[in-house]
Amino acid sequence: MTEDAFFARLFARLPKPSDAWVVPPGDDCAALAHGSELLLLAVDQIVGGKHYYLTGPHETPPEAAGRKLLARNLSDIAAMGGVPTACLLAGAFGPARDPSWLERFYDGTIALADEYNVTMVGGDLASTPNDDVASLTILGRVEADRVCRRSGARPGDVLLATGTFGSSLGTGHHLSFTPRCREGRWLATHGFAHAMMDVSDGLLLDASRICQASQVALRLDPDAVPRRTPQTTVAQALGDGEDYELLVAVGEEEAEALLAQWPFADVPLTPVGRFLAAAVPQIVDSTGQPIAVQGYDHLS
């Protein structure tokens, strides 16, 4: 069973949320009506030996691990077009983690929180005989009429991607990435985004989630996807994951204006495909042949 299939079964068992929950489970954040704005809520975690490494050639400084924990959550707020405001951090750490290591871990989180004006308002700390697990819950806000969801892509929309893709582990990007809060906020406030999400599990897999949520197909140009290094292959760009870039669906007429107005010279914005009407949500190539979806799945 895939991760998405598991969650579909789980969500079907949950009570229907009240109308105050404008965005229910299944998007990058949940969203609760709060006056003229929405309160955004998301949670993400990192596991030692999976999201950062305790030993070996990719051994991770504790500051980098703590930074990554918050950065992953900031990327979810960015995907909704929101502004991050506060967070809570809960961690269970193994016996080798002395107070000095823990302080350095929290230093990494706090430094990034200061950079993004996020207040750490609470959390929990525990020990474990196993690998570290740390979870962060983030809160944010967005205007009710500007929130971006996965489900708004329309036939004819252009799919654009920020940044570059692939080779995340080899380049250290999986630790040093910049959450696209600035870019996501700009796209939301300027009204360009019909749908948006961040890429954590690979471009193909996350693009397929937009297709599923929006009930459309996507004609993707794999060769158009910007690669992180000259050595990065197309397959790596499509499936490696941990890119933490944004995928955004924009109307065909608006796409040209968006590219002309894009103010972030340090972050490329690239058209990589077009959404199509289809009976089955899927990703196809230029000839209409389905592209096998690849990416990181925690249950596969």
For the regions a protein language model found, what residue spans apply to each?
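Acidic, Ser/Thr/Pro-rich beta/coil linker or hinge segments at domain junctions
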Residues: 259-300
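General beta-strand structural signal in soluble alpha/beta enzymes
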Residues: 22-24, 40-43, 119-123, 161-162, ...
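Residue-level signal for inorganic ion chemistry
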Residues: 31, 73, 81, 120, ...
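Short, conserved charged micro-motifs
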Residues: 99-100, 147, 253-260
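Glycine-rich anion-binding loops of enzyme active sites
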Residues: 33-36, 83-169, 274
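Short hydrophobic/aromatic beta-strand micro-patches
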Residues: 139-141, 247-251
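Active-site-proximal betaalpha loop/short-helix elements
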Residues: 96, 175-243, 276
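Extreme N-terminal cap/leader segments of soluble proteins
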Residues: 1-60, 80, 85, 89, ...
